[in-house]
A protein has these predicted regions:
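A short small-residue
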Residues: 2-4, 23-27, 88-92, 178-186, ...
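Acidic/His- and Gly-rich active-site-bordering loop/insert found
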Residues: 2-122
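Hydrophobic face of alpha-helices
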Residues: 14, 18-21, 42-46, 107, ...
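Buried hydrophobic packing segments
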Residues: 45, 106-114, 137, 199-206, ...
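Histidine/acidic-residue-rich, glycine-tolerant segments that coordinate divalent metal ions
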Residues: 68-74, 89-97, 101-105, 119-235, ...
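Short coil-to-beta-strand
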Residues: 78-84, 170-177, 236, 332-334
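Hydrophobic/aromatic beta-strand patches that form the interior of the parallel beta-sheet core
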Residues: 82, 127, 152-154, 330-334
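Metal-dependent amide/peptide-bond hydrolase catalytic core
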Residues: 200-382
């Protein structure tokens, strides 16, 4: 069977299961679960993948962060293997305001179709990746080596327009806590050390460093999570929690974060305070989109009537744990329009993720991904 016929057959397979996939997506949409709590989602998806001949494992490795991670495999003894990345965690209050219920069925449909068409020469894995919105399940999956040995990893994200290419920002959230010494604000002994002054000075210093020291792509967002309990008492403990982003892991880990930590230590010393620092979420690496896969998504999305905007390799929008996958295996994550100019993480986007149009677009996305996988597979076999 030639490539064109295999592509047609893959799309026919997805058409044949589209009602079931849409039903699963609506179930996820109507029963949103936060990261690391996606029990019903995993049960539903794993049962369905097993019905289509893929061996499924829930809870990957002994890593506690991967209790709701899963994988569905077939043909892992083949020379080549393709990974399809699914997500299913929701957002607090908004539910599926990032459309992970659609991501799940796009990758499920593509994996099922690819596994049936390419099973003689290719292994297939659907990875269920938990907690993208919080701890980043793929970070831990990559650290555990789960993506090693794959020839490609594919995922499509719903959005407000069609896009291919680009990158994502590296991020490594940081919490800084200053410890001072409490006393009454009117104490004549002047024995207090104001931890809040330290935190405020660090906040102001970061604003200046963004202008003078950091690379231009650096982004730091910060809030005070502890700032004292009474206005007439010198604050003995103050905490600044921040998301810190850079264009690359190198910029972030070698320039931006060391500068912030050094400044925190300098400020603490100048006041006679002490300081504790820790990363409260893991490192999300920048995305290294594979140009071959980007070109194929550009080509196939256009053929399906979804001509994408091609982003420059250095254009970034937010951060994602898919970046960590891209350091391990050739990866691409295009964006498929489910509502013109809609912004993710909004009530409107959550509605679109459960709409008839959103579901129809997800079925189209599954077909696009399956066709890209087949063309990419053939290019590696030549």
């Amino acid at each position: 069977m030639n490539l064109k016929n295999r592509e047609i057959q893959a799309c026919t397979i997805i058409d044949g299961i589209q009602d079931e996939l849409k039903s699963i997506s609506l179930f996820l949409h109507n029963n949103p679960e936060l990261g690391q709590q996606e029990v019903r989602a995993v049960q539903t998806i794993s049962r369905y993948m097993e019905q289509h001949g893929l061996d499924t494992t829930v809870g990957l490795t002994t890593c506690p962060e991967l209790r709701t991670a899963m994988r569905s495999d077939i043909g892992l003894d083949r020379l080549h293997k393709m990974a399809f990345l699914g997500e299913y965690d929701a957002l607090p209050e908004l539910g599926h305001g990032c459309g992970h219920n659609l991501i799940a069925i796009m990758s499920m449909g593509a994996a099922i179709a690819f596994s049936q068409i390419a099973r003689d020469t290719w292994g297939t894995t659907f990875f269920g990746c938990p907690a993208e919105e919080t701890i980043g399940g793929k970070v831990f999956m990559a650290n555990e080596g789960l993506f090693k040995g794959y020839d490609g990893a594919l995922i499509i994200h719903p959005g407000g327009e069609n896009e291919v290419g680009g990158t994502s920002l590296a991020t490594h959230p940081l919490e800084v806590t200053f410890h001072g010494r409490s006393c009454h604000i009117a104490s004549l002994t002047d024995s207090g050390i104001n931890a809040l002054d330290c935190a405020v000075d660090l906040y102001q210093s970061i604003k200046m460093m963004k202008q003078d020291i950091f690379p231009k792509e650096a982004i730091v967002g910060a809030i005070f999570t502890q700032a004292g309990t009474a206005p007439n008492v010198v604050t003995d403990k103050a905490t600044l929690r921040m998301t810190v982003r850079g264009a690359t892991v190198s910029d972030l880990e070698d320039i931006i974060l060391p500068a912030i930590k050094a400044e925190a230590n300098r400020i603490a010393t100048s006041y006679g305070a002490t300081v504790d620092m820790h990363h409260y979420e893991p490192l999300f690496k920048d995305m290294r989109q594979d140009e071959r896969l980007v070109s194929l998504f550009d080509e196939v999305m256009t053929e399906f009537g979804e001509s994408p905007r091609k982003l420059p390799p250095d254009e970034a929008d937010g951060s994602t744990d898919v970046g960590n996958v891209s350091y391990e295996v050739p990866t691409a994550q295009p964006t498929l329009n489910i509502g013109n100019q809609l912004e993710a993480h909004t009530p409107e986007f959550a509605c679109a993720a459960g709409s008839t149009y959103g579901l129809d677009q997800a079925i189209k996305g599954a077909k696009i991904m399956a066709v890209v996988a087949l063309r990419y597979a053939e290019s590696l076999e030549v």
